[in-house]
């Protein structure tokens, strides 16, 4: 094994074994601090884009509520609730903080060996109105990229939606990967990205 091969292996093996770790997308500043106590509470998932979703999935998914409950050990217990017809679907998981501000790994304890590792990064937030969240997961030889737009209420500014679109573009997501909101005729402010 030559020195270049060894260097390549050293640099890529952690990502191959551990999944992808979010890096700060172009046009977004690295968080220098993250205030978990301000982030906790109820959020509405107002925007969702995912590279595995297609236009035909839109009728199946729509805005939903997510609750971030801060535990004593700085982990978040996350509970999601979505209505589907006359039924309410709920699912929960734990987010474990990493050493980077606003970055977490999703706890897969109990999921068994080989469970998918998911890295989640709060890219941007003001804590009171909106948050942009990037999730990267390696599953069955497929990289899954998800971008979420969270709001404290159902109203969101045009600038925030533009920032959401900018973040999806940095992740090579297209309008076909946007599940909601419907942005078919949206005109992006070119000064935002």
UniProtKB/Swiss-Prot annotation:
Residues 1-19 form the signal peptide. GO terms for molecular function: retinoic acid binding. Disulfide bonds join 88-193. GO terms for cellular component: extracellular space. Gene3D superfamilies: 2.40.128.20. Glycans are attached at residues 143, 172. It comes from the Eukaryota. The keyword ATP-binding does not apply. It is found in: Secreted. The keyword Translocase does not apply. Keywords: Disulfide bond, Glycoprotein, Secreted, Signal, Transport. Its main location: secreted. InterPro entries: Calycin, LCN2/LCN12, Lipocalin, Lipocln_cytosolic_FA-bd_dom. Binds all-trans retinoic acid and may act as a retinoid carrier protein within the epididymis. May play a role in male fertility. Belongs to the calycin superfamily. Lipocalin family. Monomer. This is Epididymal-specific lipocalin-12. It comes from Rattus norvegicus (Rat).
């Amino acid at each position: 094994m030559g020195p270049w091969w060894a260097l390549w292996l050293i640099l890529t093996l952690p990502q191959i074994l551990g999944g992808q770790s979010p890096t700060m997308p172009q046009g977004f500043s690295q968080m220098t601090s993250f205030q978990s106590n301000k982030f906790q509470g109820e959020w509405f998932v107002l925007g969702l884009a995912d590279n595995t979703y297609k236009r035909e999935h839109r009728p199946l998914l729509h805005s939903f509520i997510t609750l971030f409950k801060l535990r004593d050990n700085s982990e978040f217990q996350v509970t999601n609730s979505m209505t589907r017809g006359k039924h309410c679907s709920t699912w929960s998981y734990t987010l474990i903080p990493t050493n980077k501000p606003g970055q977490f790994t999703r706890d897969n304890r109990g999921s068994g060996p080989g469970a998918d590792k998911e890295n989640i990064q709060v890219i941007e937030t003001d804590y009171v109105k909106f948050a942009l969240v990037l999730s990267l997961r390696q599953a069955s030889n497929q990289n899954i990229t998800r971008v979420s737009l969270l709001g404290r209420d159902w109203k969101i500014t045009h600038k925030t939606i533009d920032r959401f679109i900018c973040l999806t573009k940095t992740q090579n997501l297209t309008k076909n990967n946007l599940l909601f909101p419907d942005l078919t005729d949206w005109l992006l402010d070119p000064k935002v990205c």
